[in-house]
């Protein structure tokens, strides 16, 4: 006999979800025939008795290339999904500016995965902020979160007015049901929920816990990076991004809407589901992306290029070439460079780097960086291959090698990432991380050959 949780998981998994390909397209979709008006946005009376409503992700007068809005045709207008809010608290979800009081000194930091929950937690309850950067009130910067949970958001719904959420599952697949449709998101995939978009999260599959990472982007929205001399192809190709088709709930049962606004949390009880959009059209919408479709480029003769070539998505700042936050992927790839130290080189950086590992092993760290783990290398703090990685790359035969079984990523921002107290006191913090470089001995002996013994 299947238990209630197993039946739920099987029912969700049996859904064959449909998607529309493309990045930033002007989409149109309806879940009932004739629900989408033709030739206009706001008819005097919408079919099916629906309400027309615009969701704006940019100012009305933003340039055409960055102007984002969608028209939604819904069972009730969003004013009916609100009421008299009451303040609530998610004590582990922090927002910039947030300078925490803790005893941990400055340094390069690394953590093992979050421990599994001891009680029942849904997606929202399982979010733990590791770092914050910038200022949500001026809409710049980001926060890096980890999550771990083991229960569905059944009648709980949420939207974030502070920024868009880039969700990176590491263990356990998710069904993310948004106002504009459903997305199934497995490890090695990502999804993005735009600022202000209502959603809930359910579990797919059988795991003890569902775990992953979130980048909360307070600033300009994520977009595809310019390819420059690379040309029209490779990296993340627009056709591989998938936006969900319209889907809705028409249920009248006690539900709870929760909102994050300027770092504070609020809740209101309503008597129906707010996921009631029957049809929509526009370019402000959620999407998912399979990281395995990322087409990397790299050095094919010598040297190691800058990690910016691995940028999947970038959220620009007001300064050209300087990101508010980048989402960078280190995927499987061939290493073929001649007379070259092939791993990422030793580095001090104006940008601040938060890293995670989805599966496998990261080529610059032979040991200690595990799936579900995290590392933080803040601005101008030195980092690079550990001793074992250096020895292997320095003495190994330089034949073509496929770097396989790896999927690491980075949230990189122009702002220093401030550690939360939770992160500073987390039991999985590796006290010995700094020792991974202790074996890098002096090889200079005054001769051109050096001491490579």
From Swiss-Prot:
The active site is at 304 (proton acceptor). Pathway: Amino-acid degradation; L-phenylalanine degradation; acetoacetate and fumarate from L-phenylalanine: step 4/6. GO terms for biological process: L-phenylalanine catabolic process; tyrosine catabolic process. Its cofactor is Fe cation. It is an enzyme of class 1 (oxidoreductase). Belongs to the homogentisate dioxygenase family. This is Homogentisate 1,2-dioxygenase. It comes from Sinorhizobium fredii (strain NBRC 101917 / NGR234). The gene is hmgA.
């Amino acid at each position: 006999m299947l238990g209630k949780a197993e039946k739920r998981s099987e029912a969700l998994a049996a859904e064959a979800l449909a998607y529309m390909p493309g990045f930033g397209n002007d989409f149109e979709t309806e879940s009932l025939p004739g629900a989408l008006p033709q030739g206009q946005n706001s008819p005097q009376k919408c079919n099916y008795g629906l309400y027309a409503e615009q969701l704006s992700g940019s100012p009305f007068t933003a340039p055409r290339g960055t102007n984002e809005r969608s028209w939604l045709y819904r069972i009730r207008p969003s004013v009916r999904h609100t009421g008299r809010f009451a303040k609530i608290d998610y004590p582990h979800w922090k927002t910039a500016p947030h300078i925490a009081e803790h005893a941990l000194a400055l340094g390069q930091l690394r953590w093992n995965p979050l421990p599994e929950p001891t009680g029942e937690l849904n997606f929202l309850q399982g979010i733990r902020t590791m770092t914050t950067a910038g200022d949500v009130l001026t809409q710049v910067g980001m926060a890096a979160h980890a999550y771990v949970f083991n229960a569905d958001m059944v009648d709980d719904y949420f939207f974030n007015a502070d920024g868009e959420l880039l969700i990176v599952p590491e263990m356990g697949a998710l069904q993310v049901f948004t106002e504009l449709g459903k997305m199934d998101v497995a490890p090695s995939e990502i999804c993005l929920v735009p600022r202000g978009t209502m959603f809930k999260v359910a579990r797919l599959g059988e795991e003890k816990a569902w775990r992953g990472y979130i980048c909360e982007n307070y600033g300009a929205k994520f977009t595809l990076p310019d390819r420059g001399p690379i040309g029209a192809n490779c990296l993340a190709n627009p056709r591989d991004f998938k936006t969900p088709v319209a889907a809705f709930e028409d249920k009248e049962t006690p539900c709870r809407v929760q909102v994050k606004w300027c770092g504070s949390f609020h809740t209101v009880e309503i008597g129906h589901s707010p996921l009631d959009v029957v049809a929509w059209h526009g370019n402000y919408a959620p999407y998912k992306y399979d990281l395995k479709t990322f087409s990397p480029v790299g050095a094919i003769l010598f040297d190691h290029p800058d990690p910016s070539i691995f940028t999947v998505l970038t959220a620009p700042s007001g300064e050209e070439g300087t990101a508010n936050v980048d989402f960078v992927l280190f995927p499987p790839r061939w290493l073929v460079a001649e007379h070259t130290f092939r791993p990422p080189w030793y580095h001090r950086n104006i940008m601040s780097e938060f890293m995670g590992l989805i599966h496998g092993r990261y080529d610059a760290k032979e040991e200690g960086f595990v799936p579900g783990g995290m590392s933080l290398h803040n601005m101008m703090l030195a980092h690079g291959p550990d001793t074992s990685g250096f020895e292997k790359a320095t003495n190994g035969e330089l034949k073509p090698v496929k770097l396989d079984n790896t999927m690491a990523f980075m949230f990189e921002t122009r702002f220093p990432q401030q550690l939360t107290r939770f992160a500073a006191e987390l039991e999985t913090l590796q006290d010995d991380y700094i020792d991974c470089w202790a074996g890098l001995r002096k090889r200079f002996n005054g001769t051109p050959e050096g001491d490579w013994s």
